[in-house]
Amino acid sequence: MFDLPTVAPIDMEDSWVTFQAEGEQGQDSFSSSVNLDDSLTSLQWLQEFSILNANVGKAPSSGDSHGYKHLFGAPCSPLAADPACLGMPHTPGKPISSSTSRASHLGLQPMEDIDYKTNPHVKPPYSYATLICMAMQASKKTKITLSAIYKWITDNFCYFRHADPTWQNSIRHNLSLNKCFIKVPREKDEPGKGGFWKIDPQYADRLMNGAMKKRRLPPVQIHPAFASAQAAASGNSNRGSPWQLSVNSESHQLLKEFEEATGEQGWNALGEHGWNAISDGKSHKRKQPLPKRMFKAPRLSSSPMLCQEEQTELGSLKGDFDWEVIFDSSMNGVNFSAFEDLEVTPPLSPVTRSVDLTVHGKHIDCPQQWYPLGQDQAVVQNSLDFDETFLATSFLQHPWEENRNDYLSNSANIEQLFDLNEEFPAELNDWSALGSYI
């Protein structure tokens, strides 16, 4: 086991007596300090404070309730002695800035009575551009150096002799950026270094009158061509509706040439029905919706699916045509009046390889576009439309021979068609008795 340190009873008694003595002495000093230093937390000075006795230069009264002896220039309140409170107003209301408090001992003076040559505390109420202009005019020369401008400013204004030399940077910036000043290069025969500066004659009067205190950017100049185009665009936008399409004269002329060039190929239909030109004197066109298609447009002979020979053979089908006139002219008087009640419908399936495409004894191979394998819907529709026209043409060029036997009679007879294995009764030979079986 560890041995615990033991303290002698005599030492403990001595330390306890010493502690009690120190405690009694501290209590006495604390009570005395409370009685003496009670003024540190007292606000009685705030009640006695007034504006009349707040003057620093006023001599303090001999009688003091707290027994303090005021010296000349001593603060009239405990807070005034704090370094953080220096420069702050002693009374609420009007705050005092640091710049005005430094010159408060000089008193308030009018601006006309201030001598800027001898007063180092007041900054001249002039801009840097005005100071430069004053220095140039005082020199009685057409051009002046930068060092001469510095010298004239420091000679006539004491403030700049004692101020921070950063004001010289402001002078250089004004000379470089302000358009009222022009830099004149030094001649080769002139002694010294650096260039000269002078006032632009067109801005001299305005600068002296105080109109050019601040450097202003010149107004943005717009080219006359862009200005006229912008004005025309704004005028058109005000007159036209948001859905109105504006077309200039050049585009209008190109559109006319395009319609004339494509008129022979049938594009004139689009020009007549797709666009309705509504002229208001300014070459405007408004797009109108296409009218509802009530009839099927005739097939054009310039279809890309027909070769040159087929287009020659289909010459009679160009434009609008009448079936009866074509039938009468092609068949030389053959009566096809029954076709008036015939409704021509497109075939249910595309043309296959077995279709006879012989025209005037010449065989034409079926184009690859007619095959149904691997075709999209648009190609199938085009082939259906072409089949209708081509079959009608082939029928007109070589009609079926009259001595041709019926297709139904060649393929099957009556007995095979109705599957009749027995002979008809004798009484069925009489056609009059056939009605009883029906």
Swiss-Prot record:
Its main location: nucleus. GO terms for biological process: axoneme assembly; ciliary basal body organization; cilium assembly; determination of left/right symmetry; protein localization. Keywords: Activator, Cilium biogenesis/degradation, DNA-binding, Nucleus, Transcription, Transcription regulation. Disulfide bonds: none annotated. PROSITE patterns: FORK_HEAD_1, FORK_HEAD_2, FORK_HEAD_3. GO terms for molecular function: DNA-binding transcription factor activity; sequence-specific DNA binding. Pfam families: Forkhead. It is found in: Nucleus. GO terms for cellular component: nucleus. Residues 123-217 bind DNA. Belongs to the FOXJ1 family. Key transcription factor required for motile ciliogenesis. Activates genes essential for motile cilia formation and function. This is Forkhead box protein J1. It comes from Xenopus tropicalis (Western clawed frog). The gene is foxj1.
